[in-house]
């Protein structure tokens, strides 16, 4: 009598179940390890996917004033957050690439201080820690030395007393003359007094936290900041500007 070569009934049943399980897992985007009956999550995406984000290493200066500032009578004014700003997340390895980088200004003969103080790392805000530019619309421009991926621009105008700087505009560009690939990443000049275009961002009160602007990883070599006086007087001030980024690939 010829032996029965058909697989035992229980083996055929297990094979059918395993095939069904594999099919279901495939529909869910899961994989099954060979010979295993448990599903495994897909492996992490390969290079080119979204990078892991970590808090950028910001060191804040000591606050120069405390309490809630009095009504500054400035339109379109942002309400105080009332708590510390949330950490800003960027890819690991992002640093302040503006430290000690060259700076030029629309006013190269400041009333107080030197233009180089804009990137010297001193952000305390006390006397001797800031540069004072003349009245009307003025700007400072930082040369990062090469194209960078810019994730955030953080700056302090003057935080010794509460005040609001007017027509604040932050731009990125590929050239020093700001004629190539110019992008505006912040603009609170709501009535286009500066002639740079009306912006939708709000005015804000200067504090020791500075103003942090999300640049979203934009590629640029030059960073320019404008202002047009402040709520206390017609002069323009900069304590420090930091640019958080990394060399462009």
Residue ranges and their predicted role:
Residues 4-23:
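Bacterial N-terminal signal peptides that target proteins for export
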Residues 20-33:
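Bacterial N-terminal signal peptides
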Residues 33-43:
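Signal peptide processing junction and immediate N-terminal pro/mature segment
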Residues 42-67, 106-108, 131-139, 147-148, ...:
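Trp- and acidic/polar-enriched beta-sheet ligand-binding modules for extracellular glycan
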Residues 78-88:
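Short linear interaction motifs
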Residues 86, 90-121:
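Predominantly extracellular/luminal regions of secreted and cell-surface proteins
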Residues 150-152:
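Contiguous beta-strand segments within globular domains
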């Amino acid at each position: 009598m010829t032996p029965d070569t058909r697989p035992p009934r229980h083996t055929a049943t297990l094979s059918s179940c395993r095939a069904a399980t594999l099919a279901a897992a495939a529909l869910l985007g899961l994989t099954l390890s060979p010979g295993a009956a448990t599903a495994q999550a897909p492996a992490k995406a390969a290079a080119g996917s979204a990078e892991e984000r970590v808090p950028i290493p910001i060191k804040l200066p000591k606050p120069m004033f405390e309490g809630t500032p009095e009504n500054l009578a400035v339109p379109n004014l942002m309400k105080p957050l009332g708590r510390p700003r949330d950490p800003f997340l960027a890819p690991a390895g992002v640093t302040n690439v503006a430290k000690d980088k060259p700076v030029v200004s629309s006013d190269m003969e400041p009333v107080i201080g030197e233009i180089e103080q804009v990137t010297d790392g001193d952000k305390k805000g006390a006397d001797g820690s800031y540069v004072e530019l003349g009245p009307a619309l003025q700007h400072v421009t930082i040369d990062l030395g090469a194209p960078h991926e810019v994730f955030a621009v953080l700056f302090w105008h003057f935080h010794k007393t509460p005040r609001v700087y007017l027509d604040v505009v932050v731009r990125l560009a590929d050239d020093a003359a700001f004629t190539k690939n110019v992008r505006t990443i912040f603009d609170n000049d709501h009535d286009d007094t500066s002639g740079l275009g009306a912006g939708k961002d709000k005015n804000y009160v200067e504090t020791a936290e500075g103003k942090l602007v999300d640049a979203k990883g934009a590629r640029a070599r030059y960073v320019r900041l404008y202002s047009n006086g402040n709520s206390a007087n017609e002069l323009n001030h900069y304590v420090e500007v930091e640019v958080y980024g990394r060399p462009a690939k």
